[in-house]
Amino acid sequence: MATDQERHDQGMTVRRAVLSDAHVDRSIAATTDLTADWQDFITRVAWGDVWSRPGLDRRSRSIAVLSSLIAHGHHEELAMHLRAALRNGLTIDEIREVILQSAIYSGVPAANSAFRIASEVFAAEPGSAAGD
């Protein structure tokens, strides 16, 4: 079994690959005494344990995450994970399909919000078809 430090190191590697060095550096710089344990926890558990598992590739994990964030209305996290989905190889067309599929199970208002957020993210994202 991996040590906490090994899990943290693996988690940081995956977290940086998925979210970008710049995003992770901003998160670390914003860490306070209140949030330090939280940052360690999400790095070890979310990124080191779950995102590092071999059962799904990162594209598939991004689809699962987008669907969940849309369903629960977590808009700030949705914007972050839309960018991550592009980094993980999803296309804008595939993300559109994820949002459309989510509308059936999460509702039209959830999809409306997701499409608005996706439009904003893609417009600002260098290299995406909507951001060129």
What does each model-found stretch correspond to?
Residues 91, 108-111:
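Alpha-helix boundary/capping and short turn/kink residues
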Residues 63-66, 70-96:
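Mid-chain, well-packed structural core segment of small domains
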Residues 42-46, 63-70, 98-103, 114:
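Short alpha-helical scaffolding segments that buttress acidic/His motifs in well-ordered protein cores
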Residues 1-59, 87, 112-132:
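Acidic, glycine/proline-rich low-complexity segments that act as flexible tails and inter-domain linkers
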Residues 104-105, 122:
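Short Asp/Glu-rich motifs
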Residues 77, 101, 108-109:
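Substrate/cofactor-recognition hotspot
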